[in-house]
A protein has these predicted regions:
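Condensing-enzyme catalytic core mediating Claisen C-C bond formation in acyl metabolism
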Residues: 1-51, 137, 152-204
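Conserved catalytic cysteine-centered active-site region
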Residues: 34-42, 54, 58, 83-136, ...
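Phosphate/pyrophosphate-binding loops at sites that engage ATP/ADP/AMP, CoA/4′-phosphopantetheine
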Residues: 63-76
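Structural alpha/beta core scaffold segments of enzyme domains
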Residues: 65, 133, 139-141
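Short loop/turn motifs at secondary-structure junctions
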Residues: 72-75, 134, 184
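Short glycine-rich or small-residue beta-strand-to-loop segments that form or flank ligand, phosphate
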Residues: 77-83
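Short beta-strand segments
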Residues: 82, 112, 137-144, 166, ...
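Short acidic/polar capping segments at secondary-structure boundaries
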Residues: 85-87, 115-116, 143-147, 153-154, ...
Length: 204
């Protein structure tokens, strides 16, 4: 309890969001969880992925629109989608192409199930695209619906993840034109600490 209280007060998280409406309604109006003792039958993976597919695209699309609203650049040549809380085929990349009316020739890359560092990997790929083609306009969008994967067992990992992670999306446009205003990507470095692999493990 002391560890959890410390993490809660030191986390710096003011607001957490969820695509699950149950948290604001009485049990009689729940849509995701069964209004039964013990929440049984507990939502299975199929239901979680169904909710992911219904909500992830909308969140990602809104994040991209907000990103484009802050720049003169409107042309997207490359699309990188990032997520580890859901996937399907056809995937999020195809859905976003249709929502954004992107040409079918748009270069698409999907980064799935890499976890918290996936956004850095996406930036690395976008940087490589831009160095190869100075006319590249790479849209990165990350979307995670963590609350869909809530587990009711009272383990430290489950409690910690429920405390830290929620639902949301963010987008960034990476371009090769250095004359544009904005942040610059200088270089990347990564390494793997073998003894700590289990610290960020997650299996379906």
């Amino acid at each position: 309890k002391r560890k959890l209280k410390f993490m809660y007060h030191q986390g710096g998280i003011e607001t957490r969001y969820s695509v699950i409406p149950d948290y604001q309604f009485e049990k009689s109006n729940w849509e995701f969880y069964p209004a039964t003792k013990g929440l049984e039958p507990f939502p299975n993976l199929e239901k979680r992925m169904d909710w992911y597919n219904k909500n992830a695209g909308t969140l990602a699309y809104e994040a991209i629109k907000n990103c484009l609203a802050k720049t003169k650049e409107k042309n997207i040549t490359h699309l990188i989608t990032v997520s580890c809380t859901g996937m399907s085929a056809p995937g999020l990349d195809i859905e976003l192409m249709q929502l954004l009316n992107l040409p079918p020739s748009t270069f698409r890359t999907s980064i799935n199930f890499m976890g918290c560092y996936a956004a850095i990997h996406a930036l690395k790929i976008a940087d490589a695209f831009c160095k190869t083609d100075k006319h590249a306009r790479v849209m990165i969008v990350c979307v995670e619906l963590c609350t869909l994967h809530f587990q009711k067992e009272k383990t430290l990992d489950n409690l910690t993840s429920s405390m830290l992670f929620a639902d949301g999306a963010a987008a960034a446009l990476v371009i090769g034109d250095e004359t544009e205003n904005g942040l610059f990507i200088n270089h990347f470095y990564s390494t793997v600490v073998k003894k700590r692999k289990k610290d960020m493990a997650w299996a379906l």
